[in-house]
């Protein structure tokens, strides 16, 4: 590993990628891959990668991200007027032939270096469209050696420190093999830049360009509305199209509530401006004053009956309100209605609730309060039923008494008859017994056990009920308990000292050598015994002196 670090150049930039599965400390080679590193750092500074996911995972190969759409088909570089280009429009195709632009006029070129290879896990590379010079905002991390990517994708960074284990955990997630999409994708929360070698880099924000034509049209519309105020009056002959709407706003909503019958009237009032606009568009050469007069002429025959309908409406509404002075349904907001629907849905899903009437809660004891709310109560057994414990106990006692009475009435055990037949001393008696025995047709053997019906024998043996009166008896196990047996076992054990055995073998060899030289073995033994007796006598004399 140290050799790999010695071969790779020194990194000149550093960032920390904060994800939902931990941090990733990344070092960038901005000197060897300036275009790729500038693109990555600028997008990270602008917040382009915030809240994006790693949309592709190939276990043992790569973990890919950097697409704001999360599909793998999006993403753009800073060199082609992307999302954070400000007021600038995307570059025309005839102007995308600079040093940073690729041959197709989009993205930017690849940057390969002889000292940057995909030879281990934790390396950062730039994803492309499987074609040269098509790099964008997408990037990937290697999960293992990927030699096939050398010369195809730009390597511009590596993971430093123990954060590579966070990457290994991300690579062990569940994935859909068909789409290579993680089941639970990891999200990039933000990217923190620690070291930025590009001093001229500044954070950019996306600014939406405002079209001046739209503002002029809105101003013209406002001016037309202001000009219509001079026609506001409570007369029956003349009035603006918006007069009924303004008149309704003057009513106090706490006293007069909108009735559902006025909905079609409002639709007709709102549809009038659309009709007037169509007429104005068809008559472009007519002056504004003439258009207003025409509109007034068209609306005058329709307005009087509408106003007559609206005037008697308030007393009718008051009568309705007298019957129900406190309407609660219209005052409820959308949030309150949603909460009520959720509460009703939860109530319908419960098994214990059978009616909508409120049930008074009983005070729970200390033991019942410890039972969780999600627990289900078991069914109580009916007393006296056949499946109760009392009935089972009584049945078991009856069976036990019946078995005990059967043991008492059992016959005594039969004594085992000797299997071998006693033969007489005379051969004639033995021969007579053999003649009386039946010979088998297959082996010609008297009382052949192989040819007898074994099933009948087992049946006869099974019919014997003497086992009920049989008593179990075993021989006393005295091994290890009786002191005499223990001492006998100790005496039988033979302990051999290898040093004593070696000494004995040495003496035997010496005796054999002396015997060959002329000295008898018996004389040697006598000399050895004499020396031993002399030592013992000397020791006894010394012990006797001490005793006195």
UniProtKB/Swiss-Prot annotation:
InterPro entries: Cyclophilin-like_dom_sf, Cyclophilin-type_PPIase_CS, Cyclophilin-type_PPIase_dom, Cyclophilin_A-like
Domain of life according to the entry: Eukaryota
UniProt keyword annotation of Magnesium present: no
Domain PPIase cyclophilin-type: 11-193
Enzyme class: isomerase
UniProt main location, coarse: cytoplasm
Assigned GO CC terms: catalytic step 2 spliceosome; cytoplasm
Residue stretches of biased makeup (Basic and acidic residues): 328-340, 353-366, 406-428, 504-516
A Gene Ontology molecular function term of the record: peptidyl-prolyl cis-trans isomerase activity
Keywords, ordered alphabetically: Cytoplasm, Isomerase, mRNA processing, mRNA splicing, Nucleus, Rotamase, Spliceosome
UniProt subcellular location: Cytoplasm; Nucleus
Purpose: PPIases accelerate the folding of proteins. It catalyzes the cis-trans isomerization of proline imidic peptide bonds in oligopeptides. Involved in pre-mRNA splicing.
Subunit structure: Associated with the spliceosome.
Stated name of the protein: Peptidyl-prolyl isomerase CWC27
Organism annotation: Gibberella zeae (strain ATCC MYA-4620 / CBS 123657 / FGSC 9075 / NRRL 31084 / PH-1) (Wheat head blight fungus)
Gene: CWC27
